[in-house]
Amino acid sequence: MYDEILSNYTDSEIVQICKFLNKDYNIYEPDEVRWEKIKYAFYKTSEQTISELQKETFSNEFINRLMLKYYACERVIKYHFIKYLKKAIHDIVAFEMSIGDSRIDICRINGKLCAYEIKTEYDNYDRLETQMKDYFSAFERVYIIVPIQNAETVQAYITSQCGIITYRLDESGNMIFAYRRSAQDNKCDINFCLNSLSSGDLVKIVKSLRLKPLKTKNENLELLLDVAKEKNIWSIYKHFLKEKYKEQWNYLRGNFDKILPIDCQSFFSSKMNPDLLYEKEKNHRACL
């Protein structure tokens, strides 16, 4: 039925459908709400056909299958790259870490603090200059991940210090990543990094230095900035990040095979039990 439905649409129309469904895709929405969006998006398909489809699958599963095959958006690239990164058992990985005025798509903490910014074939480079300025202030190595056909174009928007990773899909639908240019080691700005942290994060670092936390965020920030003038606390900052994201990353790694691909980031953030979420959707389907 899946192929039968899609056969009524051109590839271009399917991409537009994927864009619509991806825009506000939310795993916490009720299954019936997502199905209403699917009905709206597949405007050539009868309600009866969609109702029959609902008996075969649940909305998350249908949207995931659609995205993986037809729409290599950021969620899809993240899934494939995380699948690649999780093989390094001693590394800690985080999503959407705030730094300055930017949010890095993927942060990797091993011996080095690494940033990975994803630019898909559907993205432009309008904000890349600002993003790169923030990333080079906060990460020891910075990479940009782009489609293989954009490897040359993107070089006009990044410095020679930035590494380039390309991706492509093979005939089996597997995503192949290749390091086209190595990232050069970069000296970070600890003051900039500390300024990007929340009040609670600053308190944890203060305590890790065996100091007494002060009353306000600004006071704790000034305390740490003063300490940073006297000694190098970069390793302490990196250790803090590793501890901050370790539990979430280990949870995602441990449940990776139970989670639908484009749902990975949501489960990283929430640590929700995938068995419970998807079982709820399956039970709803069984009641139709």
Label each region the model flagged:
Residues 122-168:
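Catalytic cores of nucleic-acid endonucleases
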Residues 172-245:
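A conserved mid-domain beta-alpha-beta active-site/ligand-binding segment of alpha/beta enzyme cores
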Residues 54-93:
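Acidic-basic catalytic patches of nuclease active cores, encompassing PD-(D/E)XK
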